[in-house]
Structures are given as structure tokens and as C-alpha cells.
Amino acid sequence: MKKRIILLLAVIIAAAAAGVAFYVAKDKGHEKAADVSVNTESGDELLVSITDTDLLTKYYENDKVIHEEKLTSYPAFALDQKQQVLYYTGNNEQNEMRLFKLDLKSHKKTMLYKGAESADSLFLSKDRSTIYFRLGKADESNFRIAAFDLKTKKYKNLYPAANDQDDTVSSFFYNQKNDSFALLHYSVEEDYKKTDEANEKGIDPEPTTIHFAEGRQNKFNELKSLNQFISDIAVSDDDKRILFTSYTQKGTEQTASIQMLNADTKKYESIISNQKSFKLLIDAQPQFSKDGKNIYFLAEAKGAKKLKDETGREAKVRTIYSYSLENKTFKKVWENPNGIINSFFVIN
């Protein structure tokens, strides 16, 4: 049950398999995109990654294109808004992961790291000295949280312990305000066992037990365990409220809902489900607004436009919505009809 990521019908896999070459980036000089519709809550700014039908990935700061590049792997990225620096990953022809630093003012691009590892879910530390990311190694079946030192250009393992080959991190979130983490983790052995049993019986697999934890660097405290399919996690600035996307699966039919867990009481409730106007994605990526009064998330709008990429695969356009916790109302926040949103962040 390793983290499921749905792109333009898995164009990432197609690109990697085809050995897509690395292209020199075209800098758009903070070009505004006419097709982008933005309607964020007051004071909020979004960082959005989107891939179009030509497999060109663009990075937006609200409605401004701050960078674009040919897709070579799943786009993982983080923005230092104060210094106007974009950190992002991309693979080369040998399928090696590379971490780049792009100065958005001078347009200077620097490769910080190259290796056989995989990296996703990039977060910039509070003091801007470190990139936290989810690490995957070819010789391990589990995923980890690691910290990349921007000065030494080396990374170190944070969680789980280096000798632990069973515990795997399916998703994590870094709270820059409190310099803290929230994460989802589970047992690889349990997951394989349940998958094998389901295959033998020809039935849908039972969800692997997902454990919630939070803390700082090397000290994480367990919060709760649930037997549900859960794909992502995010926290409020005060670390008291935790958002996650849970979904059920019956055959090929998947139904998602966004839940909120109280870190103190350990109780949780469903707060967002499918509506007449949209269908939630199973990786809805819910996140709090800066004031904590709204929740941003990904969904497919009713009648969403279908796109076909250069490989012939089809997918529907995704939309970022917001939900008011006070008024219980929804609104469209960010949409581009010419590409598929990979992921987004509320900029701190």
C-alpha cells in the first residue's frame, strides 16, 4: 500500500519507462497564465504543480508561472518564498534522482544532489537550512523521512530507525511554524500479507493498519491507529487538528472522504464528502488555510474536461476547492483546464 499517486493517468511511470530525456528549462519570468482561475481565501497563496498533455510540468505561485520543465519523474518541490528559491526534483536519462535549487530572481539553477534514491514530499525547514523529504531506496521495501542539509549537501535518516526494514512512512507533513512533523506509517509485512491473502481468495484486500504519529526530528509520539485506506496527512499550525483522506474500495470503485482528527482527544470525524458539484480524489491532499478557518483540497468537478497526453492516456482535469469550517460552504479556488494538478501547498 505504498503511497498512491495519480497523475495524468500515470504519465510519470510512462515517462520513466520510456527514459524521457532531461530538457533545459524554459524560464517564464513569472508569466501570468491566462487560463488559470484563482480565487483563494483572504491572504492565502498556493504553490501548484501541474502537468500538461505534452508532459510539460509547470510550477505556479497562485496564477504566476515561476518555472516549467519537461516531466521526467513525479514532481516534488518546495518554495522559499522569502528568498525566491524553488527546490524541486527530476530524473536524468539513467533514471537517477536529482535535487535542484532554482534562484527565481537570477534564474540560476544548481544541482544539489544526484543519486539512485527516490524523493517526494519536499518541505523546507523553519530556518531554511534543510529540506525534509520522503526517501525511497532501491534496496529497501520501506519509505523513510530524511533531512537534506543544504550546506553539506548530504542527507540523514530521521524515521524509522536505520535498521528498521518493516516500518514504512506512507505520508508525512512538516509544520514549518512549529518545526514539527505529522506522519502516517504502517508495516510492510502486514501489507504484503493482506495483499497476498486477498489475491489468493480473489477478493478486495483489507486495509493495512495505519498509525498516526507526530513529533520533532527523532522523537515521534503515536496518536492513533486505524484500519482504513488512508492516503495523506496535514496538520493545523497549532498541531491540534490533523486532516487526512480516507477511502473505501470495492472492485474498481473508490469513495473518498476527508476526516479531521483531534490530537488531544484522539477522536475523528468526517468533514468533507462527495458533493453534487464534485467528486473527491482518493489523494485529496487536504490542507488548512493560514488562519485555520478553511480547508483546501483536490477534487474532480462535475463535467470535468478530459485530457489526453502524448502517450494516448486520458485523465480528467482536477480542481482545488476550499471548504469553510464556519459556514460549511464550498468554492472553486484554483483550476487550469489545460493540465492535471499533481500536488499543491498552502504557502506559509
Swiss-Prot record:
Superkingdom, natural source: Bacteria
Pfam families: PD40
N-terminal signal peptide: 1-26
Keyword terms, alphabetized: Signal
Gene3D superfamilies, sorted: YVTN repeat-like/Quinoprotein amine dehydrogenase
Keyword Signal: yes
InterPro entries for the chain: PD40 (IPR011659), WD40/YVTN_repeat-like_dom_sf (IPR015943)
PANTHER family referenced in this protein's UniProt entry, alphabetically: PROTEIN TOLB, PROTEIN TOLB HOMOLOG
Name under which the protein is recorded: Uncharacterized protein YdjN
